[in-house]
Amino acid sequence: MTNIRKSHPLIKIVNEAFIDLPAPSNISSWWNFGSLLGVCLTMQIMTGLFLAMHYTSDTATAFNSVTHICRDVNYGWLLRYLHANGASMFFICLYLHIGRGLYYGSYTYTETWNVGIILLFAVMATAFMGYVLPWGQMSSWGATVITNLLSAIPYIGTDLVGWIWGGFSVDKATLT
């Protein structure tokens, strides 16, 4: 007589997804950070879009727009805190995902590792652009902190920083 979990049509689906899942037996919680990265990225995009609907980047009104988001927009305070803390969680998951790959020797899979490195550089470039977008996400302070190491390059450091910033548009509390 066959087991009901393998013969019943509905229970068979649950069995194949949870019980008899064809996965290695040594998978631990270290292997879920890729999925958490996707969740964090989705949360960042959604909350960022909703926050951008109410944010103004002008120096005179930026603080008031953030106050408006927190006080007047339904759950605006929650959107703001989810967006701020979601960025930190995203990078924590990213570094743990990379650490897991280093620990388990995933760098031996050259193609996969190279794609991961390209994605890491793309994430870092996107984070930089999130700080210094011309429509006002951050400020001269954010651009300076991120590009400070580049300014130490002899002879070309100062010009390189100015080029990466996009000229001399970085000069106020918000970029407008």
Curated annotation (Swiss-Prot):
Keywords: Electron transport, Heme, Iron, Membrane, Metal-binding, Mitochondrion, Mitochondrion inner membrane, Respiratory chain, Transmembrane, Transmembrane helix, Transport, Ubiquinone. One of its GO terms (molecular function) is metal ion binding. GO terms for cellular component: mitochondrial inner membrane. Its cofactor is heme b. Binds 2 heme b groups non-covalently. The chain crosses the membrane at residues 33-53, 77-98, 113-133. It is found in: Mitochondrion inner membrane. Its main location: mitochondrion. Pfam families: Cytochrome_B. Heme b b566 binds at residue 97. The keyword Transmembrane helix applies. InterPro entries: Cyt_b/b6_N, Cytb/b6-like_sf, Cytochrome_b_N_euk/bac, Di-haem_cyt_TM. The keyword Ligase does not apply. Belongs to the cytochrome b family. The cytochrome bc1 complex contains 11 subunits: 3 respiratory subunits (MT-CYB, CYC1 and UQCRFS1), 2 core proteins (UQCRC1 and UQCRC2) and 6 low-molecular weight proteins (UQCRH/QCR6, UQCRB/QCR7, UQCRQ/QCR8, UQCR10/QCR9, UQCR11/QCR10 and a cleavage product of UQCRFS1). This cytochrome bc1 complex then forms a dimer. Component of the ubiquinol-cytochrome c reductase complex (complex III or cytochrome b-c1 complex) that is part of the mitochondrial respiratory chain. The b-c1 complex mediates electron transfer from ubiquinol to cytochrome c. Contributes to the generation of a proton gradient across the mitochondrial membrane that is then used for ATP synthesis. This is Cytochrome b.
